[in-house]
Amino acid sequence: MDNKQHNTSMISLLQYLFSILVILVHSGRLFSQDVIHFTFKSFLGRMAVPYFLICTAFFLRGRIQQGLCNHSYFRKLIKKYSMWTIIYLPYGYFFFESLNIAKIYLLPGFIVAFLYLGMSHTLWYIPAVILGWVIIQGLLKYVGTRGTFITVVVLYCIGAVETYSVFIQSTKFYPLMSTYMSIFQTTRNGLFYTPVYLLAGYLLYDYFNTDLFTKSRGL
């Protein structure tokens, strides 16, 4: 992609609309009609996080191509994340208290929450983005684009088992998945979920001006 300025107003508009959809996804039933409810909550709403991830990687890749360092971006992101973590500390404390765990495990619990799950279920996204970005940068460096693509797709497919676990209940893989879930709670994280979308945004920037996206194709 070249360095000329591009109009990003549509991207911003979609980000705003998807932000609203994220709120709706975490709300109760939206519509009485099953089809409409599914369309908004389970279809359109579930597109929000992938969209944000792809946009993030797209612009981070652009900064790299322009010779800019992304360290400042991630420093600012970590500062904001730390601020929101502090705000949610009381919530996290009462959550751990509700689990009736020994006080000795509170500090390790807070550390795990900060580095992995987020102090609130709304904060998981930031550590997942950071870890996912580190993973694809490392993979691209050592195994190249093709190897990275294969790896992140395999990781994503493994992570998808959380959603479709009913299909593996009679297999030997199910006990392994159950053990993983009992420890790590979810596959919606920086290892299994975010890398594939971050790589998509990364490659989208690289191929944005190729015939794949610019050449009109008649149906």
Predicted feature residues:
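Membrane-cytosol interface segments of multi-pass membrane proteins
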Residues: 1-168, 214-218
